[in-house]
Every structure is written in structure tokens, then in C-alpha cells.
């Protein structure tokens, strides 16, 4: 457990870093209902604590872009302090809204639900957006871990998986967007699982740069629910002196069911009787991980399809794909990796899709992932349940 003394030191440090920050919660002329509330939920009780603090500083730097009658609400759990909820707007700057007096597991589903319900209750709004900061493993890795970890007791990392996240978010108002400033989260399995709780899913199918999004450049987009603005602002910041680039996309959830119906026809046909792509074909498909890393399920969805469809079929399919994933960005043609990919380049630029899809695989590791895929709605609705996989 963290001591109150450590908490006090960290709190004072953050307060000094953000000159506008105080624990005064008296705000004159607060509206009954806000136009926009952008929630940033930082799971930083791990090696990303410093990144969480830097991101809050960037949000403060961009506060003048926050529209009238809008706020950014930040929940931050870091390794050196108890969780804090901040509120940020253009007029008042950054203020502490709630200081926790004990540790909590920020990845626990009940904790997440209670924290988000508290924010929604106290900051009623017409529109909500939700951003996650964390480590990420996509849709599948060791018992379906996806977001986190929270390692406050230093004995075992605790993560939040995507089906559980979907269950939490179903209990809350519909979101304009969910933005994962997190590695590997932009997959069709994740986006489809969340299709009924948000209009847009924004994220990367690959690793993201260490600093993540340049929040000072996208504060207005976060508040306005502008998925395109989030992607464009993020992409515009990279590459820089240290980081090669970033891969991003925005998924229109309103198109996902039609897109999945189109895709399922081809999945059921090509992958019937446990058929799969050959190893030679797999080598040519755009990947966001190395062949033998823990992330071998990160194949670019648009890069897969030309290998399993005729030209005519592909043209019909890609028309639906372009509606579902209308924005894909990788301006530098490469991305920064910490070792999960030995070829971090967009080498199939013609079919760059900006979203990954799992291809079932044989072998022990493949069988584990194949079984985990069955926990996702994508497995049934995309037709995988009829292929023998």
C-alpha cells in the first residue's frame, strides 16, 4: 500500500506542475447539462506513470481549445500516488475534483463502472467521449487480457479484457467515440465487440510511440467527438526526432454489422473445414508484429482479403470496408516498435487497412487463441463458428 506521505508528495508535485490546479471545486455558473464531456481514463499504475503525468500536462496546454460548455474529466491512477479525478476547462484550468484516500484496482470492472458512473452522474452531458491510456495487448493474450495492467500490490498484474469492458460500457450512456491511446487495440474483434456502445473506435493496430497522442493538439477534437480530428491531430505529430511514426484508423461502428454480414460470406467459404492461408501467403500479408512474437494475430484485415477473394469479390468487399473504416493514417509509412515487430513498415501500402484481424492458426499457441476468439461476438457473427475453427 502506498503511504499518505508519498501521496502527499506526488500530489504537491502535480499541483506545482499544473499552475492552475487546486482542490477548490466551487465553480460559478455551472450548467445543468454540459454539451460535451470528454473522459480520459488513465490506467497508469505501472511503467506508464510518467506518461500519464505528461499527458495531463499536454491537456492543460491545450485547454484553450476546449469549447464553451465542455469539460475534460481525467481519472488518473499512477504507481506513485492514489487515484485522482481532475476536471479541466478553458475558463478554470485544471482542478482536482476528487482525491482518493486508498489504492484501488483501476482495471477491475466494478471499479471502472463505479468511477465512470460517478463522472457521468456529476457531469451530465449531451455527448460523452472516452479515452483510455494504458498498456495494451489487443483482443487476445493470456486469458484475454487487453488493457492495463494495475500492479498496485506488486504480486500480480491485473488487466481488463474487452468482453468485460463491453459489459461495463453497456451500463453507461452511449459514447461518441472510444479512443484507445494504447498499443494493438484497433482490431476488428475489439471494434465489433464495442459497436453498440460507441459511434466510433479510434486506435492503432500496432504499437504506438511512447509519448502516445499529442493531447495539446487534440483537446478540441476530444470534446467535440471528432474521430477524424483525433486521428489527424495524432498523425500530424509523428514522425519526430525520436519516434518513427504511428499507424491509426477510425472505425464507424454504425457500418460494422453490414460490413460483418458481407465479410462472413467469404470467411465461411474460404476458411471452411479449418482451411487457412498458406505460410507463404502469411509472409506477404501486412503484419503489425513479428511472426513468432506474442502478437502473431495482428494481420492487416484489408491486406488479407486479396489473397482469399477473387478480384470481383474483393471490389465488393472493399466497398463495405471503406465505409466501416473510412479513415486510415500512416503518413510516415512506419511505426515505432519496442521489439514486437522486426519489420515495422507499411509494405503493402496498396491494401493498407489500419485494422487487424486474426487468422486462426494450428499449434499450441494458435489453439489457445482460437479458443479465446470464441468469447467474442465477432466469432459467431463473422461466420467463424461455421468453419470448424
Regions from the language model: what does each represent?
Residues 1-19:
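Sec-dependent bacterial lipoprotein signal peptides
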Residues 14-37, 359-361:
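Bacterial Sec-dependent N-terminal signal peptides
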Residues 72-128, 132-134, 139-140, 144-157:
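Substrate-binding cleft of extracellular glycoside hydrolase catalytic domains
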Residues 37-42, 71-76, 128-132, 176-180, ...:
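Structural recognition of the beta-strand scaffold that forms the well-ordered cores
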Residues 46-50, 82-83, 364-369:
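Short, solvent-exposed loop/turn elements at domain surfaces
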Residues 43-45, 51-62, 109-118, 187-188, ...:
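Short alpha-helical segments and helix-capping/turn motifs at coil-helix boundaries
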Residues 25-77:
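Acidic/polar, low-complexity intrinsically disordered N-terminal segments immediately downstream
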Residues 24, 31, 117, 122, ...:
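Terminal, contiguous helix-loop blocks that mediate binding/assembly
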